[in-house]
Each structure stands twice: as C-alpha cells, then as structure tokens.
C-alpha cells in the first residue's frame, strides 16, 4: 500500500521512516537530513550499502534497484542513500573543494549514525563523492569495501549559457525534449561536442554552437531559436514536456523544478573543478550497458585514465 500511495522512492522511503518512527514526517527531526535510510541493516548484518546519485541530485535514478534490493528475502545489508537536493548546506556551499568537503561531511553523518562497515556506490558525479566519503571513512578507521563507480567520467567541457545543460537536464528527468524545442537527436549533439571539445580549451561558447553548419546546421538553428526565449520560458516548456506517467519526479520535485536545474548545473561545475588525489582504498569502475550519454558521450573513453589518477591500490575496470 505504501508503494502504491507513494510512487517515487523518496516518498516511499519517507513513508517507511515515518512508519518505523511512529510519527508523521512533519514531526520528524531527520526530515531535512540528506542521509536517507531506505532499509536498515537486518539482524546479524554489519554492512550499510550507501548510494550516491549523479548530478541530478535525487534518488529516482535508483528506483528499480532499490525495490529489488529491499525485496530480496536474503538481504543481509542495510540500504541508504544521500539526496543532495534535501541538503541545504550542500546547496549553499562554495564550489571550490566542494566534493572533498561534502565527502567528509557525509562520512561524519554515516559515522554518527552508528554504522561501521560500508559499501559505497556512486553514479556519475556521485562516484566522486563516494570516493571522497570513503577516504574520510578510512581515515576514521571504518571498514570500507571497494568503492563502486558507475559512469564516473572526467568532466572537461565548460559551457557558456544553459542551452545544452537544459537539454541534458530534460533527458535526465524523462522529458520529451523535442516537445520543449530542443533538438531530438543525441547523435547530432554528440557530433557537435566532438567537433567543439578541443577548441578554446574545452570551453564551448554559444556563438560556436550558433555558427555550426552543414549537417549540424539543424542544431545551430534549434538553439538560435531557443535563445530567443527567456530561461524561465524554456524551463516551463521543459517541465510541460514531462509525461504525466513519469516516475522520475515527485510532486515536491516538480514544485522545485527550476531549483533542481540550478543544483544540476552547479554539480556539473563542481565536477569540472574536481582534481583527483591519491586514494588508498580499492575502486571498481563500471559503465552502463547503454554507452550513449545525454550530454558528454565523447568523454566516456577517458574514465579508466581518470580514475587511475586516484587509485593507489587496486583499480578494477568491470567491462
């Protein structure tokens, strides 16, 4: 019943917390904590499995996986996750050393929650946070299994303006971006990024996009037209392009649609500024079967070299 009444994982997780606490969410002092306990460690278990989402910040990326893990009758591990969009301190902190600073604070939250043994899994930018959290946990004497990163790619492209970031955001939340006026073809975007990525030290200006020609002229014309709308108008169109049966966003998320975009954009900039430092723990690097990315597919082949800059110990790349 709880899952039916609370269709997204965040709503369902809060429902579980409310039931276990025996009080309403309005009375819960932990409501604003970025650490969400999806399922506590079963009796006899020792390990908390902790998930870190990508740049979008919330946990709907893990919906299906959480349901499978929680429903496993032989489960011996707890399941938790960090939701950046619930973390006011995260949203208000500076960008310099952001990922390192947040990783240390998240390690403190895990330790103060009473857990001692961890498996950390991070998707995309969340992989960087998982590494920094693991670093702090190891320094504190905790037992940390090999950190799993999924599509944690080096971010080297910096954009002028928001046009392509808005398209990427729309794809991440399940919007039909073509209905919002964006170019539909991912391949077209990939070709444009491939062409522009080595110019101006990876900084892509809006004029560079507008001046694309030949088979990329469709993309140039699309974004010249998009530029004629205000940012608010573009985001409203993107919001309207989300299907009614979409399971990516909760009702509260929709109310914060523009704010979540700013969080997404900010996380991207923080990832650009991240400099890998030697990490004494073990790493397992995984990639999604779907090799297409809604934004930076041309960067994906650099994943292994990027993580090698971190790994002092064992780095295993899982094909």
Q: Model segments located where?
A:
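Phosphopantetheinylated carrier protein domains
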Residues: 1-7
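Short, Lys/Arg-enriched alpha-helical microdomains
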Residues: 9-11
């Amino acid at each position: 019943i709880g899952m039916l009444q609370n269709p997204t994982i965040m709503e369902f997780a809060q429902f579980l917390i409310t039931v276990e606490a025996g009080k309403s969410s309005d009375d819960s002092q932990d409501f604003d904590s970025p650490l969400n306990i999806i399922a506590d460690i079963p009796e006899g278990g020792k390990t908390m499995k902790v998930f870190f989402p990508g740049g979008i910040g919330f946990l709907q990326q893990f919906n299906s996986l959480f349901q499978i893990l929680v429903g496993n009758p032989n489960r011996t591990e707890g399941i938790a996750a960090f939701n950046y969009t619930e973390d006011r301190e995260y949203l208000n902190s500076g960008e310099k050393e952001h990922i390192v600073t947040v990783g240390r604070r998240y390690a403190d939250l895990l330790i103060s929650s009473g857990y001692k043994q961890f498996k950390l899994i991070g998707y995309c930018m969340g992989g960087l946070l998982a590494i920094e959290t693991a670093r702090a946990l190891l320094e504190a004497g905790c037992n940390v299994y090999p950190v799993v990163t999924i599509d944690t790619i080096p971010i080297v492209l910096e954009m002028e303006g928001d046009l392509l970031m808005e398209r990427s955001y729309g794809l991440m939340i399940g919007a039909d971006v073509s209905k919002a006026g964006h170019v539909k073809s991912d391949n077209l975007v990939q070709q444009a990024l491939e062409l522009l990525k080595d110019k101006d030290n990876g900084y892509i200006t809006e004029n560079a996009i507008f001046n694309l020609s030949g088979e990329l002229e469709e993309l140039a014309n699309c974004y010249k037209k998009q530029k004629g709308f205000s940012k608010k108008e573009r985001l409203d169109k993107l919001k309207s392009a989300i299907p009614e049966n979409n399971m990516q966003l909760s009702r509260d998320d929709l109310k914060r649609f523009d704010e979540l975009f700013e969080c997404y954009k900010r996380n991207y900039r923080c990832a650009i500024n991240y400099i890998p430092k030697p990490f004494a723990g073990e790493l397992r690097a995984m990639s999604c079967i779907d090799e297409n990315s809604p934004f930076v597919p041309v960067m994906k082949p650099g994943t292994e070299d990027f993580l090698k800059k971190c790994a002092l110990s064992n780095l295993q790349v899982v094909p």
